[in-house]
Each structure stands twice: as structure tokens, then as C-alpha cells.
Amino acid sequence: MAYTDKLRVVYGDYTLGVHGEGFDYIFSYAQGGLESIVKNGYEWLYRCPKPTFWRALTDNDRGSKFHIKSGSWLSADMFIDCKGIQVIMDGKEQKQYAPDNNSYGGDVYADEIIVTYTYETITTPETTVLVSYTVDVSGKIRVDVHYHGVQGLPELPVFGMYSHHRPLLIYLYKP
């Protein structure tokens, strides 16, 4: 890699690649999230992490009919939709990525890139969640998640990010 102290950014038709020393990340426009994390040749993700709003019911939930009162969050959890993507590279918003601009831009390097996805729930009334991934030259990813609640929504069972990733096994050797 020509600039080992910079991120190499690759704009694709459906993805944005961010590459550095020992890591490769792919952000999907179509899937609406971080699609691939490869560190030292090992793939960590099975699919894009997404906001989650639902949890397993307890007996108390069933007794109080919580699942009836807050059931719209189960639908929001299953059918969340990505409505927008924003890419900021070294503090400047980028308009270069597809599908708005499908021309090849040549080699692009950056010190930091922030990819923000705006998700919209199918609740009534609807609300939004912003998920931002900030990548620096060391390969660290900072994830910021912001839920924008609105009046009139039922009680929220849980809020977080759900991720499918490969298991990690650590073997410790003690003499």
C-alpha cells in the first residue's frame, strides 16, 4: 500500500471499501450497514449489524400484556429500513459515492472516514435511528447509535445493536 499512514477508500457501485494495514472494511449502500470486517485475513461478520428493539418475553410481560401494548416494536425490529447514507471523509461530506456518482475517482486516501446510516422504523408514529461508524488509520471502529424517540410510541422493550459474527475461541495455556 502506497500510503501506510492513510486509509485507502474505494468507491463501488453498491459498497464503500475502507482499507488499511491489516484490515479491510466494506460498508454496503444496498444492505444499509457495515457488511464486512476483515482483520488480518479473518472475516468477522455474517451480516450487517442493525438496530434492535425487541427482546424475549418474560412471564410478567405476558401477564401484563406487554407484547400486545408494545408489539409494534417487534415489527420495527424485523423490518427496519435504511433511508439514507452519509459519508464524511476528513471532515468533508462526500457526494462521490454511487449511485449519485458512478464515475471512477482514482486513488482516494484519508485519515478518518465516518459512514452514517439513517434507519426509519415502521412504528406509528415512525422514528429514526442514526448509526455512525468512524474508522481511523489504525483500523479502530467507533460505533455511535442514536435513537430519536417521539411522543406517542409504546414502551420500548430494548434498544441496541444486533450483530451476527463468527465465534471467537481463545485457548489459554497455563504451565
Tell me the role of every PLM-derived stretch:
Residues 1-175:
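Beta-strand/loop-rich accessory regions of lumenal/periplasmic or secreted enzymes
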